[in-house]
Amino acid sequence: MQWDLFCRVVDNHGDLGVCWRLAADLGSRGETVRLWVDDASALAWMAPQGATGVELRAWPEAEDEPEPGDVVIEAFGCDPPAPFVARMATRARAPVWINLEYLSAEPYVARSHGLPSPQRNGLVKWFFYPGFDAHSGGLLRERDLLAQREAFDAQAWLASLGLARRAGERVVSLFCYDNPAVPALLGQLAAQPTLLLATPGHAARQVRAALGDTLARGELRAIELAHLTQVNFDRLLWACDLNLDRKSVV
């Protein structure tokens, strides 16, 4: 089938990361995907190798863009362009239109997943909520991901980045927005041997502001990571004892 996946980049790479992962996974299963993005610049480091079956397209502006595919996904309520939606309504067989929502464990997911939203042009938009139980849309996961994780060698992967865990040291990653609690967090981490891996952008900037150029305090030492590909970001999570990810601990 032909899929059209629409993504507007807001901040901190999460929206584009989810959409790329979905597009690449669909492509690996033999599907054909057009990924429409208003700012795809982060893919230069996130997925420099591209993906089989995935065509990256700039956000459509012209009236003469390709005919909509069999499935149209708008990520996080980004609203496909009106001319594209109008062409969706003229297809002999209307495409399946999915609004991909944010991952959540809240109770509303069970109530909202799979609900239809009839549109004035006769199309129906369906709400898709990822989640953690059978009442949700589940989780996006590549078919061989668990096998890769089982075979993963954390020490070897850290060494490939020029890093090494010292004896008795825990490894912690930090990926976050600007947060006034970061200095207090670093103070707590400094109480026992900790290697903190700070991702580029918000996290690294706040860590440097709190620790200074030494990037160290007490038992804590911090490293500012370079941008990682999506594949290597998975491995970062696997290599750590604790992952502090935006607003949640994973």
Protein language model features and the residues they cover:
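Short His-Asn-centered micro-motif
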Residues: 37-38, 59, 74-76, 100-101, ...
